[in-house]
Amino acid sequence: EDIERYLDIHAGYVYPVDVPFDESMGGISVRTFWNSTPPFYDTNNLSMVAFFKYGPFKILFPGDLEEDGWLALLEQPAFRAELIDTTVLVASHHGRENGYCRALFDYCHPRAIVMSDKAIVHDTQGMTQTYRQRVIDHWPNGVLVATTGKQRRVLTTRRDGWIQFNVNDRGDFTIYTECYG
């Protein structure tokens, strides 16, 4: 039932936009990837993965992709190439265990990881330390959060509230958060 609804929605968005995205968004460009049916029929692994880029800053939004979906996308050379200079990764599936794929970090070395999640109520939500280590592997100091003056590697809506990245065209960015956690 979910897959049928997803396919109907997906088929409905086939109309071209009037202005190219990168011309109407002030220099922001987007590149998307997704898995096909078959082999995937679950909506999580059919998530559209979007890379938004402004200057050299790039943020990756993978939706609810799970490990099998990541592994399928990693078979594509263009996807692997796009991962290389990712600045920020939004953790897949709200940072849950089933959205984590260790092989992703062979190509993607983000300076920070963002997890959009609520209070911990499931054992599968305890991935913050794992994601933190993936940042430390390549960026030991993480990023500076202007609101708190602290170096961070993982930011979560659970702890930080809203998270805002102000980015200039040189790729420099400042992070602000709602909370002072």
Which residues are covered by each model-predicted region?
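Active-site HxH/HxHxD metal-binding segment of metal-dependent hydrolases
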Residues: 1-14, 110, 118-119
